[in-house]
Amino acid sequence: MSEIIHRSKTRPVRVGSLTIGGNNEVIIQSMTTTKTHDVDATVAQIHRLEEAGCQIVRVACPDERAADAIPEIKKRINIPLVADIHFDYKLALKAIEGGVDKIRINPGNIGRREKVEAVVKAAKERGVPIRIGVNAGSLEKRILEKYGYPTAEGMVESALYHIRILEELDFHDIIVSLKASDVRLAIEAYEKAARTFDYPLHVGITEAGTLFSGTIKSAVGLGAILSKGIGNTIRISLSADPVEEVKVAREILKTFGLASNAATLISCPTCGRIEIDLISIANEIEDYIAKIKAPIKVAVLGCAVNGPGEAREADIGIAGARGEGLLFRHGKIVRKVPEEQMVEELKKEIDKLAEEYFAKQKEKEAALKGNAVE
């Protein structure tokens, strides 16, 4: 089973039922593409995101119709809700009043101090954190005049400007993002931010692109950032169905052992030795394990000679041969199965492992409760 790597120490911030930062696992976030005022469409998309593994969802809040929809949306979903606000402090107040779990707004863009104070007061009263979102493409004019073009230094300076406004009002439930479409710039900005302050960081590569190119760009950039222990929430920005963003985020986190509730697939690239339809089998198993909330590593390999040895790290797997397959656990052969039964037998073994994992988790929870009572 995969081990969870804890992130760099950051200040913990509560967002609804979740804690962001403070050595907790990296949380997956996405954003709806519906018109927020269309409650039914928005809720339906959020339910699809939840099913895919999204843990926090953000909605655009560009006008009063969107802000008015917040209470009904909140009532019908199961994950924390974030309202994305630009400039209009009244929309922030309405979203907070409507029960949103977090707002994304830059206090320096709201206007007069009394407007900022009103938002901070409302956020404090309801325990709603604020995410400061710095974007390389929309840095303040004074920052661009100082540095000439978007730089990591300028992005961190912009973040600190907004942070200090909130800190002066004794508000510290802050999360920060420093996004850029340039991967190297994003990496440098997040590195500098991590050295500069201890607020949780929401990481992402903005405007990454289409499903194919955006996935690669995000994996390269966020992989580099996560490998340094930086990042507390993650969002993949794709010109695609937001469910795809969640799938990509889960795969990236699984690669680093940062997803405690996701199964992983290992499959070989195929070669002339293969006697089974490995590609279709691998795709079927990948779809099957996508919704399994247990850290199981599954292998689908085409060669019975090298397969078990190549997948010693896998919890369970199959290696194909002509007319049959080898079912193995941790590199040791369990039994042979006919080719036509390989997939179903593997699915049964995956289900058994998942049940074992959930049973152990329940035992741990019961033991912890027992210790607490004593």
From Swiss-Prot:
It catalyses: (2E)-4-hydroxy-3-methylbut-2-enyl diphosphate + oxidized [flavodoxin] + H2O + 2 H(+) = 2-C-methyl-D-erythritol 2,4-cyclic diphosphate + reduced [flavodoxin]. It is an enzyme of class 1 (oxidoreductase). InterPro entries: Dihydropteroate_synth-like_sf (IPR011005), IspG_bac (IPR016425), IspG_bac-typ (IPR004588), NO2/SO3_Rdtase_4Fe4S_sf (IPR045854). GO terms for molecular function: 4 iron, 4 sulfur cluster binding; 4-hydroxy-3-methylbut-2-en-1-yl diphosphate synthase activity (ferredoxin); 4-hydroxy-3-methylbut-2-enyl-diphosphate synthase activity (flavodoxin); iron ion binding. SUPFAM superfamilies: Dihydropteroate synthetase-like, Nitrite and sulphite reductase 4Fe-4S domain-like. Converts 2C-methyl-D-erythritol 2,4-cyclodiphosphate (ME-2,4cPP) into 1-hydroxy-2-methyl-2-(E)-butenyl 4-diphosphate. This is 4-hydroxy-3-methylbut-2-en-1-yl diphosphate synthase (flavodoxin). It comes from Geobacillus thermodenitrificans (strain NG80-2). The lineage of its organism: Bacteria, Bacillati, Bacillota, Bacilli, Bacillales.
